[in-house]
Amino acid sequence: MPRGSRSRTSRVTPPASRAPQMRAAPRRAPAAQPPAAAAPSAVGSPAAAPRQPGLMAQMATTAAGVAVGSAVGHTLGHAITGGFSGGGSAEPAKPDITYQEPQGAQLQNQQSFGPCSLEIKQFLECAQNQSDVKLCEGFNEVLRQCRIANGLM
């Protein structure tokens, strides 16, 4: 009979042993869930880093830089070629064959480089020193007035 009682107790104990296993399983499941919850936080940390501009933003920035560079280049090119070449007047300037005494270094520099060379020099210095050419509009206006006054436009 000991066998019979053993078999009965063994049959009775497995359901009792299964119940604690089922209770233990939910305890293990919460332990497994925190690492899963930690994984999204690890994924979320790169999103907190500052984003780099997209391709379109980089292209727009490059285009803006090209446009500003082109505007500065054209303005400087027109100032230099228009100031030194006489502005394309139909009648060429007649050379002065009379001898004149220089009245100072300023006058001599103006005669050797054209009547608006000081204005051109000031405008170019402003354009080189300023990041925005619009800040040099005053110098550009003075240069334009000089060119008009000397018949170079």
UniProtKB/Swiss-Prot annotation:
InterPro entries (UniProt xref): CHCH, CHCHD2/10-like
Predominant location category: nucleus
Alphabetical list of PROSITE patterns matching this protein: CHCH
Disulfide bonds: 116-146, 126-136
Keyword field: Activator, Disulfide bond, Mitochondrion, Nucleus, Transcription
Domain CHCH as annotated: residue spans: 113-153
Span(s) of short sequence motif Cx9C motif 1: 116-126
Recorded GO CC terms: mitochondrial intermembrane space; mitochondrion; nucleus
Motif Cx9C motif 2, residue range(s) on this chain: 136-146
Superkingdom assignment: Eukaryota
Protein name: Coiled-coil-helix-coiled-coil-helix domain-containing protein 2
Organism from which the protein derives: Mus musculus (Mouse)
Gene name of the record: Chchd2
